Amino acid sequence: MTVTIKRAYDPASDADGFRVLVDRLWPRGVSKASAHLDSWPKDLAPSADLRTWWQHDPDRQGEFETRYRAELDGTPSAVAAVAELRAAIAANTKHGVRTTLIYGAKDPQVNHARLLAVYLAE
């Protein structure tokens, strides 16, 4: 399974392969034309309540991961979105195409896309 993450503000490239925006909200200042997205499954993003509580605070990262995993495992629409994305990743991998999770957060370490990539690989 070949999954990487990349900021929405970084230029798209052919090496990104299948580009999936995993934020609930569209990244500010990014045009839809320049985003070059193949998919935008909003149900993979943390809920508004969880995102508001977390605020990308590194001190809350551990608790955020626990709560985010609970949402991915327990919300029917998230479960369906995870299954659909895993199937797409498997098909892409079979054809030698990478899947890139696109996110808008500033920090490449403190963001839900990194956690989601790990979750999808399990």
What are the residue ranges of the model-derived segments?
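Residues lining hydrophobic/aromatic ligand-binding pockets adjacent to catalytic sites
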Residues: 1-122
